[in-house]
Design a protein with these regions (language model features):
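Active-site-adjacent beta-strand/loop module that shapes the phosphate/pyrophosphate-binding cleft
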Residues: 75-98
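Active-site proximal loops enriched in glycine and acidic residues that flank catalytic Cys/His/Asp
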Residues: 28-29, 39-41, 66-75, 91, ...
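The catalytic Nudix box helix
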Residues: 39-73, 87
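Short, small-residue-biased leader/transition segments that mark boundaries at the very start
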Residues: 2-6
């Protein structure tokens, strides 16, 4: 007899820190009550990997190509059924932003020392911004590499 498996629905989403040497891309959402700077973000679509989601969301929201996509960590979002997965990636080519005005009000590059931060916010986005600002985005290497 086959067992029935009942699970809660979980929606995978990515938070993306796009970096270009000493700069990180930050944005403000369009049409939302939250008006502070954040990283790019979006939901995975059926049939794509989260790495493909990273590249697609960056292209859709700001028109940039990225490379060297690397996982940072995840966080369940308590206000919804979303599992946030944080990634850093590097700019691949031209840094000229083509903004999707339906999604974003603004997107701009910030030098590490000029990054606006909110130390009190307990979120994956804020943690990733602080990690980059404090120069801690390198992937940990195993001994012998």
């Amino acid at each position: 007899q086959r067992q029935m498996c009942i699970r809660d629905r979980i929606c995978p989403a990515v938070i993306v820190g796009v970096t270009d040497h000493n700069r990180i891309l930050m944005s403000k959402y369009a049409g939302r009550t939250y008006k502070k700077y954040a990283l790019l973000a979006g939901f995975s679509e059926i049939g794509e990997t989260v790495e493909q989601t990273v590249a697609r969301e960056v292209m859709e929201e700001v028109g940039l190509k990225v490379k060297n996509i690397r996982y940072y960590k995840s966080q369940p979002w308590a206000f919804s059924d979303t599992l946030l997965m944080g990634f850093y990636c590097d700019l691949d080519g031209n840094d000229a932003i083509t903004l999707d005005r339906e999604e974003l009000a603004v997107a701009e590059w910030f030098e590490r020392e000029d990054i606006p931060v909110e130390p009190s916010r307990d979120s994956l986005t804020n943690e990733m911004i602080l990690q980059f600002k404090n120069e801690r985005t390198a992937v940990k290497k195993e001994k012998g590499e």
